[in-house]
């Protein structure tokens, strides 16, 4: 029996002779439809089409292979029914020649067949990505050298504006950014020149009609509509009476003012600007609270009016921070710089093209551009027309079918237009995709191509037609209802670029059937009533402000951090998975298995954890879930270069190339290949403190130190040197891939790692390095030195390669993957984690923004005055880019939701649940009845914000509404079911490993069970054993390891307790006691801020450790350094915002800061964040220990010294403090940390071998240095 197609699917399969757009929602069977359409075209009708007369374009090579395989299977099945069919046999024979391919592969085929038309050597190859990056870097270096030699003033201004203080790296990055961006379009040089000319503007009147001005106006009208809506709601509340009538004196004219602004905007940007500059909000009339019936209504009306006021003030003070005249002048001023920059980009592009031609290589951008060059000609007037090759393709292809059309970009669209008959008679393009799943903006995917056709194509007979497949055959009704509710409430033309309404909603197409004896595995037939399926969509929120173990903020040491919320969220997920696998009520959770046609018990492999990005999350999740005994796998794409086996081999390669590298030589010597010990390293270093280890090893082998070292160590050194010399000799002539395999064999290291834990994985990693070397050998670079550069570049450009994949798809493990990697897949149970993570908008902070339609958005930079500010054009482009970023995030969320077949669980964390619920309710209350208005959606900072905003309007959202005090109109008609649970930290602080069962030992006092003297004797013996006391019991409380912070705290607590006893003894007045003892339990403290004082201190220390000491003079330099840390994801965006750059500048301007900088600039040693481990007597920690018994006991002390630096006459120790300190209480503050600083001094004295001359605390709060006196 064949597949039963829906009416819409039948139309998509059989409609011919038109351009056809199939909008296929998630789970609608679009691939099956596409394959069936092809099969019918090549096997049915009076004139079946040969399969090589079709061009089928897919998004990935894997998709192309799957498509070819499915078509082949379908033809083979048809042949089984009709073995004599010559037509079918012909199609099977032609299948290998069929153009079922990615766009890049099609372009490559066109180039190979027509290389002579573009003067290309037929022996070309596709360059390795890293090889191409190295070529780019070489070209940039040569280009800048030539430009500096020309001594061009405009170039110097460009370097001053965008270059760094010590290098041109930033300007290099900008040139590469421009190049990569323009190459995603069909006419890169033309686009760049046209967009630069937009800066050549002379009057305000020229602004009108600019595309970016229209976008700016769209953004402004959104803000004005928001402001108007809030004011009218405030008016409605005030008009209801209850004592709020005085507010109407302000609100009525303010509503008129906003309406006038909207009218002015419709008449032009100049009129709007003039009107905006005159806009004002007076002081709100006071209302006596005693006369107010409903205080909540008062607060709501006031809040709505204030929010409206902020919107207008933001437009006036930020968007239009300069006048229109200044905006025009600013753009004019940037015109020469932009022209110079575009010239550099074009020159770079030309040189890069020439270098590739010289080496006979192409990159992926070349494939599309050279293909287009072959496919187009120009007429006498310069207009583009199809070339002869393109015309031949138009005749050849009966149909061009494009899969995943929503992810096409402009140049691919142009190529499809050249080889198809889209715009002429007999249209023949079939496009299938779902714009709601367009999530590849970073690859320059342009969803507007899909949207433009979606809007203009008709649903009935026409040359341009669309068909909508919105029946979902993947998910249960519970999932469908949940997806539809969330996205009807949130997704709009503004955020999502599509209005999600009834027409766009998913329709149920899957049939799972009731759970009964006929469709369940045999072993569960008798337990039908004890089985579970599906259930509510679950929302789990970690409240980071929940109950915490009490600790004052200033007691948290700088080396300490709160337990990471990522770990806690992983524990929530661990508990949910355990609950699914083994419910506490003894039931069983079941999923439907299509292959069995029955329900079976859930397995780990049925569960996937989806994350927006796996970096910094997946590894923690794997570790935490492991503590619950959950098998889990995460393909993070990272960690390869950090594996011990790869680090060891790379260390060997580094010293074979250049042995004068101590870090690499120590790494190699410490490895099992040579097995040097730490003590032997110390012995070698003591022989000579100034020379490289390699030089010392050579001298050892030469016999210079025979009296100072053992024969065994000399033998080890000779063994190492002999091997190193042999390897260096072979490396000079062997191809690098052969040499690496020789190393594996000669050291037996490949076999050795195979015996280690995860040995198969480790050997696979080594094979990847060998394969990488083989790829390198095919490039234009040769030799070990260049290979090491190649690997270093690979680390920087690609970040990491990820460990080798050895996991089969049927392994019974929970998988962790990014939402992007999950696209096209489906899972019975989806756990969407990390939804509280804020959206990444870092790209919007860059100096220059690029947009395909709107052009170039840059700051206005005055090099001479050293000032910069955003141009009006940049404001517009930034706003547009932000809308596109958030629209894509909305679509990514849709992709995540629609991966679930039967169960969806959502987790996320917030800093303060009560505050978050208030914000969600506020956004909901100020929106329409059943939707969150786009302005409020734009305020959301995370997926969790969006989901919870929507749920405030849902019947199951009581928990959120109750916490947030929300007075909201509910959508009572929705069928989806949701359950909500908030988690406090205290619930999650124990993992499964920490949980211990209590051993309750009952001691019977009665002797009714004692029957003999023997029994009595045994009882006495048992009691003696149980009553045994360890002789050294006092030392059991003394830790073997302790941090400096813990030691400081222990002493402070002892002092605090003594002070408390003194107070109790000496003060009879109860009030005085209360005044002096001010500690409160954590739950009585006021709610903490999003970043505690301790967390801010940790962030400050991190910045002080990593900041470039050459860039600490000016505020802008420090701010730029912090921004770099955020871009590199060393700090989160929110952490970057709390860094007080002014405080940091104050330090470096202080006497102490200047002394540190002077040491740095004069080449003396400056150390930051030095970790140490030393030993101290245990009596320092436990003062009640008897020195006669414990005097020799030592405790290992560990800590981190913030900074110390060298001066002519000795070293200076420095410790940063961010604590709150009252002016005048400096002495108490010094005493508080004196023991810590003295321990640091003692440790440094041992390390340096000389006395530290001075020690300081630096208080960021007081902005002063505090000297610690010698004791």
Swiss-Prot record:
PANTHER family: ATP-DEPENDENT HELICASE_NUCLEASE SUBUNIT A (PTHR11070:SF48), UVRD / RECB / PCRA DNA HELICASE FAMILY MEMBER (PTHR11070). Residues 3-476 form the UvrD-like helicase ATP-binding domain. Belongs to the helicase family. AddA subfamily. CDD domains: DEXQc_UvrD. The keyword Glycosyltransferase does not apply. Pfam families: PDDEXK_1, UvrD-helicase, UvrD_C. GO terms for biological process: double-strand break repair via homologous recombination. It comes from the Bacteria. Residues 528-824 form the UvrD-like helicase C-terminal domain. This is ATP-dependent helicase/nuclease subunit A. GO terms for cellular component: cytosol; DNA helicase complex. It catalyses: Couples ATP hydrolysis with the unwinding of duplex DNA by translocating in the 3'-5' direction; ATP + H2O = ADP + phosphate + H(+). Its EC number is 3.1.-.-, 5.6.2.4. Heterodimer of AddA and AddB/RexB. The lineage of its organism: Bacteria, Bacillati, Bacillota, Clostridia, Eubacteriales. Disulfide bonds: none annotated. The heterodimer acts as both an ATP-dependent DNA helicase and an ATP-dependent, dual-direction single-stranded exonuclease. Recognizes the chi site generating a DNA molecule suitable for the initiation of homologous recombination. The AddA nuclease domain is required for chi fragment generation; this subunit has the helicase and 3' -> 5' nuclease activities. ATP binds at residues 24-31. SUPFAM superfamilies: P-loop containing nucleoside triphosphate hydrolases, Restriction endonuclease-like.
């Amino acid at each position: 029996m064949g597949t039963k197609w829906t009416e819409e699917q039948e139309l998509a399969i059989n409609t011919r002779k038109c351009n056809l757009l199939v909008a296929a929602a998630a789970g609608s069977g679009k691939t099956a439809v596409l394959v069936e359409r092809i099969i019918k075209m090549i096997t049915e009708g009076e004139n079946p089409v040969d399969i090589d007369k079709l061009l089928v374009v897919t998004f990935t090579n894997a998709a192309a292979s799957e498509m070819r395989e499915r078509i082949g299977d379908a033809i083979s099945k048809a042949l089984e029914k009709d073995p004599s069919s010559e037509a079918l046999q012909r199609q099977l024979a032609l299948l290998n020649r069929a153009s079922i391919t990615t766009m890049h592969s099609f372009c490559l085929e066109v180039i190979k067949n027509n290389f002579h038309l573009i003067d290309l050597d037929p022996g070309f190859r596709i360059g390795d990505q890293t090889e191409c990056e190295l070529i780019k870097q070489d070209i940039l270096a040569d280009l800048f050298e030539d430009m500096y030699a020309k001594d061009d003033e405009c170039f110097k201004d460009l370097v001053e504006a965008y270059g760094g203080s010590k290098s041109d790296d930033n300007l290099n990055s900008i040139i590469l950014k421009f190049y990569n961006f323009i190459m995603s379009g069909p006419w890169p040089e033309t686009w760049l020149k046209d967009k630069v000319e937009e800066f050549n503007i002379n009057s305000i009147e020229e602004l009108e009609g600019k595309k970016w001005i229209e976008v700016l106006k769209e953004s402004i009208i959104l803000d004005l509509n928001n402001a108007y809506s809030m004011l009218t709601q405030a008016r409605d509340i005030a008009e209801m009476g209850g004592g709020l009538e005085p507010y109407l004196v302000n609100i009525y004219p303010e509503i008129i003012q906003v309406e006038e602004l909207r009218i002015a905007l419709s008449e032009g940007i100049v009129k709007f600007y003039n009107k905006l500059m005159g806009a004002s909000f007076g002081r709100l009339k006071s209302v006596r609270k005693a006369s107010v019936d409903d205080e909540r209504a008062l607060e709501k009306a006031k809040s709505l009016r204030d929010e409206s006021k902020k919107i207008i003030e933001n437009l006036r003070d930020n968007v239009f921070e300069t006048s229109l005249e200044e905006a025009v002048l600013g753009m004019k001023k940037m015109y020469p710089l932009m022209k110079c920059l575009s010239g550099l980009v074009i020159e770079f592009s030309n040189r890069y093209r020439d270098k590739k031609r010289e080496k006979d290589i192409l990159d992926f951008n070349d494939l599309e551009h050279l293909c287009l060059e072959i496919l187009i000609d120009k007429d006498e007037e310069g207009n583009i027309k199809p070339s002869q090759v393109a015309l031949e393709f138009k005749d050849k292809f009966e149909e061009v079918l494009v899969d995943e059309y929503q992810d096409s970009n402009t140049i691919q669209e142009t190529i499809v237009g050249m080889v198809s008959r889209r715009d002429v008679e007999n249209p023949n393009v079939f496009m299938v995709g779902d714009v709601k799943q367009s999530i590849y903006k970073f690859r320059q995917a342009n969803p507007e191509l899909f949207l433009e056709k979606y809007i203009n194509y008709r649903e009935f007979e026409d040359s341009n037609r669309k068909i909508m497949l919105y029946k979902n055959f993947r998910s249960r009704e519970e999932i469908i209802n949940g997806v539809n509710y969330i996205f009807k409430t949130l997704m709009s033309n503004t955020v999502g670029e599509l209005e999600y309404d009834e027409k766009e909603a998913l329709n149920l197409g899957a049939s799972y059937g009731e759970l009964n004896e006929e469709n369940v595995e045999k072993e569960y037939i008798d337990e039908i009533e004890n089985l579970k399926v599906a259930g509510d969509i679950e929302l789990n929120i970690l409240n980071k402000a929940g109950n915490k173990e009490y600790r004052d903020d200033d007691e948290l040491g700088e080396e300490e951090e709160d337990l990471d919320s990522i770990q806690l969220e992983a524990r929530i997920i661990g508990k949910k998975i355990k609950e699914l696998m083994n419910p506490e009520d003894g039931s069983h959770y079941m999923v439907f298995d299509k292959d069995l046609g029955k329900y079976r018990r859930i397995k780990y492999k049925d569960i996937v954890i989806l994350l927006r990005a796996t970096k910094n999350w997946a590894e923690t999740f794997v570790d935490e879930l492991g503590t619950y005994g959950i098998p889990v796998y995460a393909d993070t794409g990272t960690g390869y270069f950090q594996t011990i086996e790869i680090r060891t081999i790379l260390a060997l390669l580094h010293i074979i190339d250049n042995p004068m590298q101590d870090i690499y030589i120590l790494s190699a010597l410490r490895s099992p290949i040579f097995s040097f010990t730490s003590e032997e390293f110390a012995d070698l270093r003591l022989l000579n403190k100034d020379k490289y280890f390699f030089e010392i090893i050579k001298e050892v082998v030469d016999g210079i130190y025979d009296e100072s070292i053992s024969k065994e160590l000399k033998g080890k050194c000779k063994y190492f040197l002999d091997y190193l010399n042999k390897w260096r000799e072979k490396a000079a002539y062997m191809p690098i891939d052969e040499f690496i395999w020789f190393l594996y064999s000669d050291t037996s290291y490949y076999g050795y790692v195979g015996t280690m834990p995860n040995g198969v994985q480790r050997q696979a990693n080594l094979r990847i390095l060998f394969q990488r070397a083989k790829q390198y050998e095919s490039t234009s670079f040769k030799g070990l030195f260049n290979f090491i550069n190649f690997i270093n570049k690979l680390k920087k450009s690609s970040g990491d390669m990820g460990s080798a994949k050895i996991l089969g798809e049927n392994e019974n493990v929970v998988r962790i993957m990014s939402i992007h990697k999950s696209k096209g897949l489906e899972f019975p149970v989806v756990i969407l984690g990390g939804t509280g993570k804020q959206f990444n908008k870092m790209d919007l902070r860059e100096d220059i923004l690029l947009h395909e339609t709107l052009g170039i958005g840059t700051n206005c930079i005055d090099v001479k005055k050293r000032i910069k500010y955003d141009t009006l054009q940049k404001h517009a482009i930034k706003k547009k880019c932000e809308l596109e970023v958030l629209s894509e995030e909305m679509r990514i969320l849709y992709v995540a939701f629609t991966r679930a077949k039967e169960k969806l669980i959502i987790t996320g964390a917030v800093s303060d649940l009560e505050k978050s619920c208030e914000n969600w309710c506020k956004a909901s209350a100020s929106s329409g009845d059943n939707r969150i208005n786009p302005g409020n959606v734009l305020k959301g900072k995370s997926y969790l914000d969006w989901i919870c905003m929507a749920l405030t309007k849902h019947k199951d959202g009581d928990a959120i509404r109750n916490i947030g005090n929300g007075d909201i109109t509910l959508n009572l008609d929705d069928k989806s079911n949701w359950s909500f649970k908030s988690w406090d930290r205290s619930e999650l602080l124990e993992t499964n490993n920490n949980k211990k069962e209590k051993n309750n030992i009952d001691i019977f006092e009665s002797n009714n069970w004692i029957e003999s003297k023997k029994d009595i004797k045994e009882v006495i013996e048992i009691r003696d054993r149980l009553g045994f006391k360890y002789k050294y019991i006092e030392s059991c409380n003394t830790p073997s390891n302790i941090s400096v912070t813990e030691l400081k705290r222990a002493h402070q607590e002892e002092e605090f307790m003594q002070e408390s006893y003194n107070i109790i003894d000496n003060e009879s007045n109860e009030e005085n006691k209360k005044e002096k003892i001010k500690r409160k339990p954590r739950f009585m403290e006021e709610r903490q801020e999003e970043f505690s004082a301790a967390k801010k201190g940790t962030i400050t220390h991190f910045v002080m450790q990593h900041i470039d000491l050459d860039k600490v003079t000016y505020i802008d330099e420090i701010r730029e350094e912090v921004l770099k840390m955020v871009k590199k994801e060393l700090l989160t965006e929110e952490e970057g915002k709390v860094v007080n750059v002014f405080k940091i500048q104050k330090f470096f301007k202080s006497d102490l800061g200047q002394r540190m900088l002077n040491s740095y600039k004069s080449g003396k040693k400056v150390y930051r964040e030095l970790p140490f481990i030393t030993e101290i007597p245990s009596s320092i920690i436990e003062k009640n220990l008897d020195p006669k018994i414990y005097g020799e006991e030592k405790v290992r002390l560990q800590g981190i010294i913030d900074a110390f630096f060298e001066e002519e006459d000795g070293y200076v120790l420095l410790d940063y403090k961010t604590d709150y300190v009252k002016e005048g209480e400096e002495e108490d503050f010094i005493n508080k940390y004196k023991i810590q600083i003295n321990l640091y001094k003692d440790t440094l004295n041992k390390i340096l071998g000389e006395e530290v001359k001075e020690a300081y605390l630096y208080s960021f709060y007081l902005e002063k240095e505090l000297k610690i006196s010698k004791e």
